[in-house]
Amino acid sequence: MFGFLNLNKPPDWTSHDCVAKVRKILKTKRVGHGGTLDPMATGVLPIAVGAATRLLAYLPENKAYRAKIQLGLSTDTDDITGKAIATCPWPDLTLEAVKPHLAEFIGNIAQIPPMYSAIHKDGRRLYELARKGEIIAVEPRQVKIDQITVLDWLEGEFPQIELDIHCGSGTYIRSLARDLGKVLAVGGTLASLTRTESCGFQLADSINLEALMVNSEGLISPRIALAHLDWISFTPERVIDWFHGRKINLTDTNVIIGSLVAVESLEAQFLGIGEIVVAEDEYYLQPKIVIQQ
């Protein structure tokens, strides 16, 4: 088996739970995912099967989420599943007062990950430390948020705002919820989260585990998953050189050094990914990932 799945992760499942279930359904051990989703979250969880696990790092990085943020409430996990640590009811808070602050989170920003996260600190995961009551300083990380759009606003003692968020890899929406609450001086926590896009896969095209159990055929091909890359077809002679790890001379000089190119045979068999390099004024495609099916 070789290819990808666009899985719609159910609530209360870890990403690892989903991988284990897919392994069982497809009867294969070589399965991986393209980016962890918190157990409470739903939505797109890219799954790679077989040798496609080697291609996960080459999928598009941008992600999109639909998030509901509860204002006036702070929790230890920065989401609604955690323990409340502060409340600040604010029934008079309006959307007009919140909107200007959303712009503060657009662009390249420094973001502190939640204490309850899988990030390593001194060889241990942060959530392991948090569960033992060891709260430590977490260094901010640079992340990029491209767009934030307001979808809905619910008034009340604890107002709720629903957002459509487009961002880069590594962005924590729980941190965004917490930090929005901080700038408003009322606190905030993530009430619900759905990932609508990840690694080039869209929620509208996803399948759930029940559907996969009924029909486990039809993995997504690299041709679709790697459509953002340039592609090149090799003759049988060049395929042999490719399989031996030799760099392939390119006749087309209209290329960008360092760019990645997906490779297939004339029969459309996927062969891997190469990087364009230059040596002695000649352009070559250097194998990075070689796939022999």
Curated annotation (Swiss-Prot):
Keyword terms, alphabetized: Isomerase, tRNA processing
Catalysed transformations (reactions): uridine(55) in tRNA = pseudouridine(55) in tRNA
UniProt record, GO biological process: mRNA pseudouridine synthesis; tRNA pseudouridine synthesis
Record InterPro entries: PsdUridine_synth_cat_dom_sf (IPR020103), PsdUridine_synth_N (IPR002501), tRNA_psdUridine_synth_TruB (IPR014780)
Example of a GO MF term: RNA binding
EC number: 5.4.99.25
Family: Belongs to the pseudouridine synthase TruB family. Type 1 subfamily.
Name by which UniProt lists this protein: tRNA pseudouridine synthase B
Native organism: Microcystis aeruginosa (strain NIES-843 / IAM M-2473)
